[in-house]
Structure formats: C-alpha cells, structure tokens
Amino acid sequence: GATNHGLVMFFDWSGSMQYNLTQTLKQLYNLVWFCDRVKIPYRVYAFSDAYEGAPSYSRVVSEEILVTQNPDNKSDLDVSGFRLIEMFSDKMRKNETADMMHYWYMMGEYYGGYRNWRDNGYPMQPPKNLHLGGTPLNHAIVAAMSIIPSFKTKNGIQKVNAVFLTDGVSHAVTRKISGEDINGYNKESYITDKITNTTITSDTKNSRYYSGEKQTTILLQLLKKR
C-alpha cells in the first residue's frame, strides 16, 4: 500500500534554473499534492551553494541544522560547500504548505522577470540566503545517501523514491575531506560506497577532467543500491 512508500525530492535552486523556476515549481507542487492526497511521507529540499557563510562541521549553530557527513572520515568526498534547505514535508499543516508554495513561487517569479503583478500577486525579492548560485547536484546526491535511509527508517517504510528536479550538469565534487584532490589528468577515479561495499570506476583515461556529468552517473548508481 501507499504507506509502504515515501518520496524525497531535491530541487535545483541555481542560476541556470532562473527562467525555469516557476515551471519546475509547478511540477514539484503536483508531486507534493499527490503525496498529500495518497498520504505518503515526503520531504522536499532545495540544493544551493549560495547560502550565506560556508558550512562548517565545527560550528553547527542550531539543532535545525543537520550535518550528513563525519569530518573524521578523511577519505570521504567533501561536500561541505553546499546546503540543503527544506522546502516542504508531510509534517506541515495544509495552510503552511499553501503559504510556502506561494512564497517559493513568488521568488521564482522574481527571477523569471515576472510582470503581471496586479492580477497574480507581487514577486518577492528573495532573502540573501536564497540567491541563485551554482549547481551542486552531485553534492546533493551524496547527502541523499544519508538522508534517504534515515527517512526510510524514521517513517517505517520499505521503498523510497528519490526525485531530482534539475536542468543541468553538476559541478564535480573535486576533493576528499582530507583535502586531497581527486581531479587530474589521465587519472583513474573511483568511488566506493562502504555501506553497500560497491565500487564504481569512472572512465577518465585520456580525459583531462573528471567531469561533473560522469560523477553524477556514478553517484546515482551508488544511490540506487542504497
């Protein structure tokens, strides 16, 4: 039944999405309404690297901030330069969801050059933390490997689908927590998921860069095995 399923969604809040934000938000809202209608647990996160202040493992200032990595695992991919911002969840009341849908949509209209203010409401100038930046899709996939199993356990469900609403190519995760660079000319790169004991090697021979796109493919394969 529906109660055995859940949905975790990740929304690309980046500069390349500027003129596609409102249309993509409409797609997102349809998914949220579907989850509410069939009563399945869900979470929606925006991913961004423009959030004010570099995230710090040693300076978590609020219980509302969840760190998905252990900084002592020096060989792990370092995805500390981005944030996930929770947009929606099944824990919100109906009026809270409606209000937040309006606020996110008005911010999308602001970036899209919206003009018909009188009839449909005024666009909102986004707060500094929600300015558009790069596309840390790969960073979000790495975080999802912690978030989705935890979400599954907390909700007592068997199957969780992940949805990534994005338009473009991610920039690569280029270093380990130790600071070691994983990018280089003619250098074979591989990523190991120690939980599932799966290693996937990227085809980077004779290629100058370990591209974000190749890394996305590897990370999605690893996420699927979770």
Where on the chain are the PLM-derived regions?
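Acidic, glycine-rich A-domain
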Residues: 1-226
